[in-house]
Regions:
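Bacterial N-terminal signal peptides
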Residues: 20-30
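N- or domain-start disorder-to-order transition segments that initiate the globular core
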Residues: 33-75
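Zymogen propeptides
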Residues: 60-61, 65-101
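Membrane-embedded segments
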Residues: 84-95, 106-110, 116-126
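C-terminal regions of proteins
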Residues: 37-49, 157, 243-267, 272-338
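Bacterial N-terminal signal peptides that target proteins for export
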Residues: 4-20
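A substrate-binding/cap region within the structured catalytic cores of diverse enzymes
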Residues: 120-251
Length: 338
């Protein structure tokens, strides 16, 4: 036994009243600490969420709406990722556009729903005072490229027309994407259409993080396919995202020149899958515009109380910079894969 080890007699000697009081105080203190720690662990930040809020994904806390909207004007590119067929997401985009214009800015709008082959018709429609809707949809190749109800996106298109805002067709033509699906990327690159649409020499970057996430989602949403099927779908996804990034990066060159005159920001409006974790389009744009591009991602999501914890987990994984909690669309909650 060394001198630092108390003897059995010392360890069992009667405890003084003063020591008992000290022990009692320590128990109270530790009890309070345990209670506080438990409160921190069990507090669920998503219990405070509500429809209409914008949540900072880093903190899980809602941000004041008006200052946040005003702050968007400081970015060069704003990515809004929607759930298809949800009118509240169109309304959110209109809110952002109006806020930017109220600050003396002239935002440019880019939409996934229009293909490159429809850009000339889209430009004519925006300039014309006497456009016929049915003729416009035929000329812009709406059915061929998107195919959904134009009514879903008409408010955004008409806003750009009424306010004389530039509107960019963001998506590569559907015919080009079909070639990739049917033939594979290597063979598609050899076709005349690849050169026709300015894709010759374009880097189609196969980033590991992107591959892992997109392939996993394809397999979850399209079960039963062969490895070859998934590879061709994945390659088509890469080409779409790279093509949309090409559109945005090209727009940034004149926007930066004219920024001092109030032009911009560039508002990208796509499905949320092209925004998630910055992997599909934002990272590709940043690679193409490397000079300190300032961009922000906003993921718009139907707020379902029972799925709030799942959404919080996605925020912690970095699904976007901000998540805009919205009502569900007329068709109900979005389809979930598996």
């Amino acid at each position: 036994m060394n001198r630092f080890t108390p003897s059995l007699l010392q360890m069992t000697r009667p405890v003084s009243g003063r020591l008992l009081a000290l022990l009692a105080l320590m128990l109270v203190m530790f009890g309070c600490q345990t209670k506080d720690r438990s409160a921190i662990v069990t507090h669920r930040v998503w219990d405070e969420w509500a429809v209409g809020q914008v949540v900072d994904a880093r903190t899980g806390l809602a941000v004041p709406m008006q200052p946040w909207l005003e702050g968007l004007a400081t970015y060069e590119v704003i990515y809004l990722g929607e759930e298809h067929h949800n009118r509240s997401h169109i309304d959110a985009a209109l809110t952002v556009l109006r806020s930017l214009m109220s600050q003396g800015r002239r935002p440019w709008l880019a939409m996934e729903m229009f293909g490159w082959d429809g850009q000339p018709a889209l430009a004519r429609y925006l300039r014309s005072e006497e456009s016929v809707r049915s003729e416009f949809l035929e000329q812009v190749l709406w059915k061929q490229n998107w195919g959904g109800a134009f009514e879903d996106y008409e408010p955004l298109t008409e806003f750009a027309k009424d306010q004389h805002l530039p509107l960019l067709a963001m998506n590569p033509p559907k015919s080009l994407i079909r070639q990739v699906v049917k033939q594979g990327l290597v063979q598609a690159k050899e076709q005349p259409e690849w050169r026709q649409w300015g894709m010759e020499g374009e880097g189609i970057v196969d980033a590991p993080a992107y591959r892992s996430r997109i392939l996993s989602q394809l397999q979850d949403c399209h079960g039963g396919g062969s490895p070859e099927d998934y590879q061709s779908m994945y390659e088509a996804s890469m080409v779409r995202d790279e093509g949309m990034a090409k559109t945005l990066a090209a727009a940034m060159r004149p926007l930066r020149v004219e920024a001092s005159s109030g032009q911009g920001p560039l508002l990208s409006y796509t499905g949320g899958g092209h925004v998630q974790y910055r992997l599909p389009v934002p990272d590709r744009v940043a690679r193409r515009v490397p000079d300190g591009l300032k961009q922000v991602t906003v993921y718009m999501a139907t707020f379902e109380r029972e799925r709030a914890a799942e959404l919080h987990q996605a925020m912690q994984e970095g699904i976007a910079d901000y998540v805009w909690l919205t009502p569900q669309g007329a068709q109900g909650p979005p389809r979930r894969c598996r």
